[in-house]
Swiss-Prot record:
One of its GO terms (biological process) is mitochondrial electron transport, ubiquinol to cytochrome c. The keyword Thylakoid does not apply. This is Cytochrome b. Heme b b566 binds at H98, H197. Keywords: Electron transport, Heme, Iron, Membrane, Metal-binding, Mitochondrion, Mitochondrion inner membrane, Respiratory chain, Transmembrane, Transmembrane helix, Transport, Ubiquinone. It is a multi-pass membrane protein. It comes from Drepanornis albertisi. Its cofactor is heme b. Binds 2 heme b groups non-covalently. The cytochrome bc1 complex contains 11 subunits: 3 respiratory subunits (MT-CYB, CYC1 and UQCRFS1), 2 core proteins (UQCRC1 and UQCRC2) and 6 low-molecular weight proteins (UQCRH/QCR6, UQCRB/QCR7, UQCRQ/QCR8, UQCR10/QCR9, UQCR11/QCR10 and a cleavage product of UQCRFS1). This cytochrome bc1 complex then forms a dimer. The gene is MT-CYB.
Length: 380
């Protein structure tokens, strides 16, 4: 009994089945590393966030000063803050690569796992948004004002909804305190959803680059992939440390070093880089409600991807037309990200509109057509 505690103990057995004796396809590549990297990101963010929360004051008159005090007077406070701010960027880099992997290799056909994953993405976006408001700089304040204001586009109940979310008639102290409460709560919701995500994944087992069943050729997760994952951890943590120590403000907005002032609007309000693609889609539609719907659709479209799969093959490994479309889509998203960071003037408006149209066109129309064409090419 003592020798096999790992396999018999009710709690250790679950951990063993998920991380040690888990049967894993023998041919999964480094692209399958991002799930565990996201787990590390979540742990880093919760630990650094908890340490920051012990010194932070969620009050409009003190929030900005409390963050400044943390960086100046708290032991290694500057490092904890920089790790937390840049950890969010790495979190989004990993999740976008993880989703891209799922899209390329057809992992979305594990529908339950995929749908929980999309809900995880939405929760992460909500967490990052409310977190960005907490330092109470100019971009925090105006970002919160602009994005929460979008809910007023909802017919009939919009304005009431926005004032209810604000806790008043503008973004003010009640907004900041509730955003802090939400920012503290949501990472634990993400942790819970992650466990559900893993539970669904382990029902079917991992997909692999060929997109074919791999039951006949499975290897234990430990030591093979536990060792392989450590390489990913090292690379990611080195990247995070480099970013936090050498250029901590590279991905931030200089406007946020100015305390929030409701009487002075920044010349160019924009979110953090990881929301720019959605922001560009929002801005490319002149109508407020239309823009909000397009913004929501840009992320919610992920729920439709399993339904739009027309190919007889699961993975894109042997589907050249879909591969070309996939990389066009990636480029398109990079263009949207760039356009979102630019001012609203001549060339950028039309580029944003074309890129937004192509984004929906590629996913909703061209991918299903390419799948049907590739089926025809298989059986001419």
């Amino acid at each position: 009994m003592a020798l096999n505690l790992r396999k018999n103990h009710p709690l250790l057995k679950t951990i063993n089945d998920s991380l040690i004796d888990l049967p894993t396809p023998s041919n999964i590549s480094i692209w399958w590393n991002f799930g565990s990297l996201l787990g590390i990101c979540l742990m880093v963010q919760i630990i650094t966030g908890l340490l920051l929360a012990t010194h932070y004051t969620a009050d409009t008159s003190l929030a900005f000063s409390s963050v400044a005090h943390m960086c100046r007077n708290v032991q290694f406070g500057w490092l904890i803050r920089n790790l937390h701010a840049n950890g969010a960027s790495l979190f989004f880099i990993c999740i976008y690569l993880h989703i891209g992997r799922g899209f390329y290799y057809g992992s979305y056909l594990n529908k339950e796992t995929w749908n929980i994953g999309v809900i995880l993405l939405l929760t992460l976006m909500a967490t990052a948004f409310v977190g960005y408001v907490l330092p109470w700089g100019q971009m925090s304040f105006w970002g919160a004002t602009v994005i929460t204001n979008l809910f007023s586009a909802i017919p009939y109940i919009g304005q009431t909804l926005v004032e209810w979310a604000w806790g008043g008639f503008s973004v003010d102290n009640p907004t900041l305190t509730r955003f802090f409460a939400l920012h503290f709560l949501l990472p634990f919701v993400i942790t819970g959803l992650t466990l559900v995500h893993l539970t669904f994944l382990h029902e079917t087992g991992s997909n692999n680059p060929l997109g074919i069943p791999s039951d006949c050729d499975k290897i234990p997760f430990h030591p093979y992939y536990s060792i392989k994952d450590i390489l990913g951890f090292a690379l990611m943590l080195i990247t995070l440390a480099t970013l936090a120590l050498f250029s901590p403000n590279l991905l931030g907005d200089p406007e946020n070093f100015t305390p929030a002032n409701p009487l002075a609007t920044p010349p160019h309000i924009k979110p953090e880089w990881y929301f720019l693609f959605a922001y560009a889609i929002l801005r490319s539609i002149p109508n407020k409600l239309g823009g909000v719907l397009a913004l929501a659709a840009s992320v919610l479209i992920l729920f439709l991807i399993p339904l739009l799969h027309t190919s007889k093959q699961r993975s894109m490994t042997f589907r050249p037309l879909s591969q070309i479309l996939f990389w066009i889509l990636v480029t398109n998203l990079l263009i949207l990200t760039w356009v979102g960071s630019q001012p609203v003037e001549h060339p950028f408006i039309i580029i944003g509109q074309l890129a937004s149209f192509s984004y929906f066109m590629i996913i909703l129309v061209l991918f299903p057509i390419a799948g049907v064409l590739e089926n025809k090419l298989l059986n001419p």
